[in-house]
Amino acid sequence: MVIGNTRPINIEDEMKNSYMDYAMSVIVSRALPDVRDGLKPVHRRILYAMSDLGMHYNTSYKKSARIVGEVLGKYHPHGDSSVYDAMVRMAQNFSLRYMLVDGQGNFGSVDGDPPAAMRYTEARLTRLAGELLVDIDKDTVEFMPNFDDSLKEPTVLPSRLPVLLMNGASGIAVGMATNIPPHNLTELCDAISYLIDNPECGLEDLMQFVKGPDFPTGGLILGRDGIKSAYATGHGKVVVRARAHVADVAETGARRQIIISELPYQVNKADLVKRIAMLSRERKINGIAEVRDESDRQGLRVVIELKRDGEPQQILNNLYKHTNLQTSFFVNMLALVNNRPVVLNLKEALNHYVAFRQEIITRRSKFELKAARARAHILEGLKIALDNLDAIINLIRHAENADTARRELMSRFELSQLQAQAILDLQLRRLANLERQKILGEYADILKQISYLEDLLANPRKVLSLVKDDLAEVKARYGDARRTEIQSQGVIEFREEDLIPHQSMVVTLTERGFIKRVPTEVYRLQHRAGRGKSIIKTREADSVRFIMVADTHDSVLLFTNRGKIFSIKCHEIPCDLLRTAKGIAIINLVPLAENERITSMIAVSRFDEETSLIMATSGGECKRTKLSDFAAVRSSGLLAMDLPKNDELIGAVIAGADENIILITHNGRSIHFPVADLRVSQRASGGVRGITLEGDDRVAGLDVARPGHFVLVVTTGGYGKLTAVEEYPLQRRAGSGVLTFKVVDKTGKVAAGKVVDREHQVMIATAEGVVIRTPVGTEDQEKGIIVMGRSTQGVIVIRPDENDRVVNFATMVE
């Protein structure tokens, strides 16, 4: 370029060309590893510089600053931090599966702690790293000028190890990126040996040896589909999960604990512990009492102590979903092949390594053959000298000078200049008989070596055999057991229920359609005849209509006055720890039509084929349908029963074919008949007569009447009693029934009736939202509800305020 000469250029072309030059520089000279030695330029330069400084595994450590300075000054004209960071990573046992640098000092931690400054740390090569540099002085690789043309540096290392797959690689170039996982050296050596013997083998054959990635931090890989995809195409997703187990009370001597001993690759342990603690503190994951990091020099150990009611599997499922206890490793096996970025599958990557090692051994053999032939040439001259010793000594003695002696030797004995010079350089002590035998022996050995090397170079199969021998040697010396376990079961997408612990809930629904759930433990047990606790601040003209107890995993079936059924999960109902919270409008959960309201709700744990759903209307109609018909209720609901005019559905229960049911009316009548009296009907059909009602009487409730149980009846005035099921005669359906409660003004009409046993507790709710939780029956009649005959009035079980009334009750088992 001539100074002062101005040449106009197109700015678009210049930017395009400059950016392309930059992109190719990043791709080829910075971000991507070479398929042959698996190294990026910065790693290659660090290892070569350390070898050049003599920092081998059996020498003393030297300051890291010295290494960084050597690399910067000779080979890598970039920032010192880039060189030091790359060297540090090669010394971290949680970053590389097989470390290449042996560091002394603080080289960082799995908690994300930074390493100490380079002036404080020391390093040397590991023994394994020496295998990457073996035979580099035997013309095995090409050298190129360094950045200022003052030195030469290798374009690739003659690595005896398949480093690309052994330690993996990651890097972001321009418009592309690589992310290759590490693998087990033993498996790689076995796979490459098999590939050499069976070059036409398929992916399945290779995967008999290479099971999958083997991360330095261990962990679990879920499923083989992602691995197979990555090995077949070069792209894939591998799901990695932490190794954790649940320690019971006998093991810990305290509460149950989840103990994490291995983390997914590249997960920051300190950040993980903080994340778990935050999720627990914000109540996004319940059941965790404390999180502790107990890691020490013996290994990693994170302890999650559970609360008494914490369910380990649900907590683990939540942690897998919301934290880095489960991560995805996205495989992109991109590497440089002949300085071009190429996505490789497993077989291609292994084949490139085999071809590279063939080239290295061939070049080494040619170098050694050339040296052996040169030495044989010298030894042939020395042999001639030994065979003509007296004549040669006499010739040298009478020669005018060394040049004359050399020329006469070459002329008289037909020697080359090198041979003649070697004879002149021969020490007198080499003329002894023993030394003569050494020269002859060395000559014979050299001839054998030449023959061997010539045969080796003429036979590629023997070169491949040497590749296998090298692999067997490195496998025996450096091979180890797999750290990452591969589980055959793939990733299971967590359903919402998998993340929610089983918990008993009180579900309430008001007349105006506000629904909520509250944990049952919010309500402490009380004696009968108490005033109860308020469970809701009802609005004016609103009151509690239904109350029931359900598990968070139960399906809540909601029945409407029009005979429709809706289904929601209990955990989908908003939960509030405040008893007095009003809840959410039911219309936000199910699409009720105008003037449609919920008239009954039940909780279902399983939708069995053998069980039936028995429904009843206020007018005394009953219907039996298979429960399994309602296992999948669409969001818009289903028609459960075709109702007579001016009738409405008031309740439903689950019963077996050999059981009996009982209907209870507001005026205190009841009928007890077999389920078998009701034929199984289709979902949208109508019902049959269950009980014949008199006057304005309506059905208040129904339940399954099991032997040894009691019929519990509670009135609007707060009166209640227990009556043995056996006191109710078994009748045929459609009769008028028998008396079950003597209704008078002070008791009020029957609000609800259910079948209970001694182990039950009941939660009785009033219209104003007051609830009392009381045992059904104990030996102490002052605490439990009294057992009485059918035609009695019962005793006070709750004292509702004036202008308040009992509306319903729910049963539960402690």
From Swiss-Prot:
Q: For this UniProt entry, which segments traverse the membrane?
A: none
Which of UniProt's keywords are assigned here?
ATP-binding, Cytoplasm, DNA-binding, Isomerase, Nucleotide-binding, Topoisomerase
Q: Does the keyword Nucleotide-binding apply?
A: yes
One GO MF term on file is: ATP binding
PROSITE patterns under this entry? TOPO_IIA
SMART domains this protein is in? TOP4c
Record EC number = 5.6.2.2
Q: Which family does it belong to?
A: Belongs to the type II topoisomerase GyrA/ParC subunit family.
Q: Which GO terms describe its biological process?
A: DNA topological change; DNA-templated DNA replication
Q: Which GO terms describe its cellular component?
A: chromosome; cytoplasm; DNA topoisomerase type II (double strand cut, ATP-hydrolyzing) complex
Q: Where is the Topo IIA-type catalytic domain?
A: 32-499
Subunit comment: Heterotetramer, composed of two GyrA and two GyrB chains. In the heterotetramer, GyrA contains the active site tyrosine that forms a transient covalent intermediate with DNA, while GyrB binds cofactors and catalyzes ATP hydrolysis.
Compartments where located = Cytoplasm
Recorded catalytic activity of this chain's protein = ATP-dependent breakage, passage and rejoining of double-stranded DNA
The record lists its disulfide bonds as none
Protein name, per record: DNA gyrase subunit A
- Name of encoding gene: gyrA
Short sequence motif GyrA-box: positions:
526-532
Q: Where is the active site?
A: Y120 (o-(5'-phospho-dna)-tyrosine intermediate)
Instruction: State its role.
Output: A type II topoisomerase that negatively supercoils closed circular double-stranded (ds) DNA in an ATP-dependent manner to modulate DNA topology and maintain chromosomes in an underwound state. Negative supercoiling favors strand separation, and DNA replication, transcription, recombination and repair, all of which involve strand separation. Also able to catalyze the interconversion of other topological isomers of dsDNA rings, including catenanes and knotted rings. Type II topoisomerases break and join 2 DNA strands simultaneously in an ATP-dependent manner.
Name the InterPro entries on file.
GyrA, GyrA/parC_rep, Gyrase/topoIV_suA_C, Topo_IIA-like_dom_sf, Topo_IIA_A/C_ab, Topo_IIA_A_a_sf, Topo_IIA_dom_A, Type_II_DNA_Topoisomerases
Identify the PANTHER family for this entry: DNA GYRASE SUBUNIT A, CHLOROPLASTIC_MITOCHONDRIAL, DNA GYRASE/TOPOISOMERASE SUBUNIT A
Miscellaneous field: Few gyrases are as efficient as E.coli at forming negative supercoils. Not all organisms have 2 type II topoisomerases; in organisms with a single type II topoisomerase this enzyme also has to decatenate newly replicated chromosomes.
Species, as recorded: Dehalogenimonas lykanthroporepellens (strain ATCC BAA-1523 / JCM 15061 / BL-DC-9)
Pfam families given for it? DNA_gyraseA_C (PF03989), DNA_topoisoIV (PF00521)
